[in-house]
Amino acid sequence: GVTSNPAIFQKAISTSNAYNDQFR
């Protein structure tokens, strides 16, 4: 889960934000 892998969760958010920047 998120609590078990905060680093992976953080990376997923960073990747999602990167995609959002491309579409805007």
From Swiss-Prot:
EC numbers: 2.2.1.2
PROSITE patterns associated with the record: TRANSALDOLASE_1
Gene Ontology biological process terms from the UniProt entry: carbohydrate metabolic process; pentose-phosphate shunt
Class of the enzyme per the UniProt entry, highest EC level: transferase
Domain of life where this protein originates: Eukaryota
Organism: Capsicum annuum var. annuum (Red pepper)
UniProt KW keywords: Cytoplasm, Pentose shunt, Schiff base, Transferase
Protein name: Transaldolase
Cellular component GO terms, alphabetical: cytoplasm
Gene3D superfamilies on file: Aldolase class I
Annotated metabolic or biological route of this protein: Carbohydrate degradation; pentose phosphate pathway; D-glyceraldehyde 3-phosphate and beta-D-fructose 6-phosphate from D-ribose 5-phosphate and D-xylulose 5-phosphate (non-oxidative stage): step 2/3
Catalysed transformations (reactions): D-sedoheptulose 7-phosphate + D-glyceraldehyde 3-phosphate = D-erythrose 4-phosphate + beta-D-fructose 6-phosphate
Function: Transaldolase is important for the balance of metabolites in the pentose-phosphate pathway.
Signal peptide: none
Protein's UniProt keywords contain Transcription: no
Subcellular location(s) per record: Cytoplasm
Family: Belongs to the transaldolase family.
Keyword match Nucleotide-binding: no
GO terms of molecular function: transaldolase activity
Record InterPro entries: Aldolase_TIM, Transaldolase_AS
